[in-house]
Structure formats: C-alpha cells, structure tokens
Design a protein with these regions (language model features):
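Short acidic, Gly/Ser-rich segments with clustered Asp/Glu that frequently serve as metal-coordination loops
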Residues: 15-21
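Glycine-rich, proline-tolerant flexible connector loops at the mouths of alpha/beta enzymes
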Residues: 56-60
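A short alpha/beta connector and helix-capping loop motif
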Residues: 23-51
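Anionic group-transfer/hydrolysis microenvironments
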Residues: 15, 55, 85
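N-terminal nucleotide-binding beta1-loop-alpha1 segment
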Residues: 10-14
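Short, glycine/acidic-enriched capping/hinge loops at junctions between secondary-structure elements
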Residues: 21-22, 61-63
Length: 176
C-alpha cells in the first residue's frame, strides 16, 4: 500500500517555448524562480509532482520534438510527465485523476502557463473531479493578448476564486 501523500504539484506547460528565448513571457526569469521555489518545496515535503507537457500543432514552438517543447525542469524518477493536446490536462488524460487518487492525493497545487488557458482549465478540471485545488498567487502567468498580461492574470485569479479554488500568497503555500 502506498503512503498517503495528500498533495501534488501540477506544473502546467513549463516548457522552453514560453520561458526561454524570444518567445518567452515577460518576466520569464523571475517567474521561473517562483516555480523553482514551489517545485523545491513540493519535493522537500515529499509531495507528488506531475509535469504537464503541451503537444503543440505542427509548426508551433511547442510541436513535439521542437526545442520549445522541452520541459524547463527535469523530472526526477517517479515524477510523471503527462502530455496533452487540449487545455485541460484531465480531459487529455482521463486516468490522471485516478493516478492522483491512487497516490493518496486529495489536494492539487496548480502552477504554470498560460493563466487563461491551460492553468485555468486544468485547475477547474481538478475541481470537477473532486480535488481541493490551490493556485498560488504569482504562480501562473501569460502573454499580453488584447490586454496586459497582468490584467489577464488578475481576471483569471478572480474567476478561479469564484469557482472554488484557493489562491493563497506564495509564502503561505505548504505541501502537507
């Protein structure tokens, strides 16, 4: 029988195309530092870590096999890499919820990119499957798209709170 972990960190689309080089989001270095802190905290606490990797379409910067498709953080042994081709990682991977439950996870901490697409969809997907969901303030970002990225992040944060997602400050996040 596996020991109950309780918590999992789901890193959504933390791939080179959005965090390295010309196609990176604004503030990519600082944001990568935020994610590094969350990842270190999760690993130190013995929480499950799931790396979600988007499979872009042919010609996209995150097309499978392209340099931008590669993960920024190297998964450790026992940290699954889950591929997806729609925004919600749970929709692309129907067994993901069962895998998390088998690991004893009841709370998922979701972080990564992009706020209004894959982060929001995956967080809501986790809620719909009965998990407690945490999306730390400052742990998701996006690009300017008709409005500044900061405005998009703020709007998504309010929508997540309205949906029932906990949005603590980064320094309040624990994995146990």
């Amino acid at each position: 029988m596996m020991e109950r972990m309780g918590y999992a960190l789901i890193l959504v689309d933390v791939q080179r195309n959005m965090l390295v080089g010309d196609t990176a989001v604004d503030g990519a270095a600082e944001f990568t530092g935020v994610l590094t802190g969350l990842l270190d905290a999760a690993r130190d606490a013995g929480a499950a870590v799931i790396h979600v990797k988007n499979d872009g379409r042919r010609g996209d910067p995150d097309e499978p096999g392209a340099p931008g498709w590669e993960l920024v953080f190297t998964p450790l042994p026992g940290e699954p890499v889950v591929r997806k081709d729609v925004p919600n990682a749970f929709e692309s991977n129907p067994a993901l919820a069962d895998v998390l439950r088998a690991m004893g996870v009841d709370t998922v901490v979701v972080a990564g990119l992009q706020s209004e697409y894959c982060v929001q969809a995956t967080a809501v997907g986790a809620l719909e499957r009965g998990f407690d969901v945490v999306v730390p303030a400052g742990a998701h970002t996006t690009y300017d798209d008709g409005e500044p990225a900061t405005a998009i992040v703020e709007r998504v944060t309010l929508e997540l709170i309205a949906a029932g997602v906990a949005v603590p400050e980064l320094d309040e996040v624990t994995f146990g």
